[in-house]
Amino acid sequence: MLAKRIIPCLDVTNGRVVKGVNFVELRDAGDPVEIARRYDEQGADEITFLDITATSDGRDLILHIIEAVASQVFIPLTVGGGVRTVEDVRRLLNAGADKISVNSSAIANPQLVSDATGKYGSQCIVVAIDAKRSSAPGEPPRWEVFTHGGRKATGLDAVEWAREMARRGAGEILLTSMDRDGTKSGFDLELTRAVSDAVPVPVIASGGVGGLQDLADGIRLGHADAVLAASIFHYGEHTVGEAKAFMAREGIPVRM
């Protein structure tokens, strides 16, 4: 089994790291450069930056933040938020990003994923999917894709959309459960497993981590290849090193 990754996520708005619950009630968590440096020192495998209001606010890319982080942090950086064109992908890669995450723009223009992967390779294009359970109790499970920071329903089925994005060349799927985001009640394992089992590319589980066991469950029960978390790391409940040590004790291969 390949080593599983632990990825701290920095949600950024107005130049600050924030964390909310169910995509709202945002709380300040600090300076992005300082926080990224701390996670690098703790042994994070990667860091993900998401400008969570860039698309809905119509703002430009967070190039200055990525340049500052890339000059001080030496692990892979994934960056998303406000990416609308292949030119935006180029600008972020030049600023120091290693992978680019697209979400709302992929739904508005699926060809963007095909074009970006054609030019820069699948390994640097991540498709982020924000999904919310839409099936009633007793019905077969179904999840709908949302965009614009969880504000806009699309009518798309999350599992089918993940399949389509993988067909178009996406190298990874970053899958967030909107129902679990910030709740600390654990990943939506049914959602994570449904998508992980449906696509041939790695799936990063996101949304709901409340403790170290949740990280292990995302890998073992959700079939994810990587786990992403924010609150438990930002507010000092656990370090990345503690998370890796726990995973290793659980028999999950990690890079120590």
UniProtKB/Swiss-Prot annotation:
Active site: residue positions: D11, D130
Q: Name one GO molecular function term.
A: lyase activity
Q: Which InterPro entries match?
A: Aldolase_TIM, His_biosynth, HisF, IGPS_HisA/HisF, RibuloseP-bd_barrel
EC class, as a word, reads: lyase
**One GO CC annotation:** cytoplasm
Tell me the route in metabolism or biology where this protein functions. Amino-acid biosynthesis; L-histidine biosynthesis; L-histidine from 5-phospho-alpha-D-ribose 1-diphosphate: step 5/9
Per UniProt, the keywords (alphabetical) are: Amino-acid biosynthesis, Cytoplasm, Histidine biosynthesis, Lyase
Q: What is its EC number?
A: 4.3.2.10
Pfam families per record? His_biosynth
Cellular compartments annotated:
Cytoplasm
- Predominant cellular place of this UniProt entry's protein: cytoplasm
The protein's annotated catalytic reaction(s) are: 5-[(5-phospho-1-deoxy-D-ribulos-1-ylimino)methylamino]-1-(5-phospho-beta-D-ribosyl)imidazole-4-carboxamide + L-glutamine = D-erythro-1-(imidazol-4-yl)glycerol 3-phosphate + 5-amino-1-(5-phospho-beta-D-ribosyl)imidazole-4-carboxamide + L-glutamate + H(+)
The Swiss-Prot or TrEMBL record describes its family as follows: Belongs to the HisA/HisF family.
Write down the NCBIfam families for this protein, in alphabetical order.
hisF
Relate the protein's function as given in its record: IGPS catalyzes the conversion of PRFAR and glutamine to IGP, AICAR and glutamate. The HisF subunit catalyzes the cyclization activity that produces IGP and AICAR from PRFAR using the ammonia provided by the HisH subunit.
- Oligomer status and interactors: Heterodimer of HisH and HisF.
What name is this protein filed under?
Imidazole glycerol phosphate synthase subunit HisF
Q: What is the lineage of its organism?
A: Bacteria, Pseudomonadati, Pseudomonadota, Betaproteobacteria, Burkholderiales
Q: Which gene encodes it?
A: hisF
